[in-house]
A protein has these predicted regions:
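Ligand-binding pockets and gating/stacking loops
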Residues: 1-243
Length: 243
């Protein structure tokens, strides 16, 4: 216990020293183009401009090494705003509780398509922007897009669809779709109904995963390790995903 106490004290000293050093670090110099693109007052009702501006700020922060970690929520799970520019006046939370309404489901699809397009803008900017070593920033950046729910109508939090990009300079390899359900012995596959829609068996996967060993925390553990964190555990992780 004494060793644990001394370790905690030393870690606190290191964090304090790092914070003190940061106070004396001069602000980075940025180009006029970057300043004009990011120094904007944009209302959230202009969702596209708002999303892209925040993504641009994240790219600029990574490029100038102001920070190496950033999180951007497109809106709270309960109050994600509407997107009037594509004809959506409802919040995403409202659309997710669609009750099978075809109009709501179409808007929900359009909402998610719009959101992933803005994430695509972020990846493009990372690809176009050079890091301090003159290499594309995307190579040293890991970008994870997703949600803690796979089916909002019933608050299903399993079988999460995630997009993981970047980090090739960190040894990551992409260009594949990894379906962890297929690794489960009793997984019978995905089935479509007569109308081409997914059956109720699919939606059950959103609450009861076929592969109970597939944890999102396994991916977060991989990301932490590739960032140099010396740890063998992240939350309820049980292995490191091989990518």
């Amino acid at each position: 216990r004494m060793e644990q106490y001394l370790t905690s004290v030393r870690e606190a000293e290191i964090r304090t020293t790092r914070a003190d050093a940061w106070l004396d670090t001069p602000l980075p110099t940025i180009s006029d183009a970057d300043r004009q693109r990011t120094n904007r007052d944009i209302a959230q009702t202009m969702a596209g401009d708002y999303f892209r501006t925040v993504y641009d700020l994240m790219v600029l922060a990574f490029q100038t090494d102001v920070t190496r970690v950033a999180t951007f929520s497109l809106g709270g799970e309960g109050d994600a705003f509407s997107i009037p520019e594509i004809g959506i006046t409802e919040s995403r939370h409202q659309l997710s509780h669609h009750g099978g309404d075809a109009g709501y489901m179409e808007k929900l699809t359009n909402y998610d398509t719009f959101a992933i397009e803005q994430f695509g803008h972020f990846l493009t900017r990372l690809t176009e922007t050079k890091d301090l070593n003159g290499k594309p920033l995307i190579g040293s950046t890991m970008a994870l897009f997703g949600s803690g729910m796979s089916y909002g109508h019933s608050h299903g939090n399993a079988n999460l669809p995630l997009v993981f990009a970047g980090g090739t300079d960190l040894g990551l390899k992409h260009g594949s779709h990894i379906d962890f359900n297929k690794a489960a012995k009793d997984f019978a596959g995905y089935s479509l109904g007569p109308d081409g829609a997914l059956t109720s068996a699919h939606y059950q996967l959103c609450s009861r995963p076929a592969n109970t060993d597939a944890h999102m925390s396994n991916l977060l553990l991989l990301m932490a390790q590739r960032m140099g964190v010396e740890t063998d555990q992240f939350g309820d992780s049980n292995k490191v995903i091989a990518i």
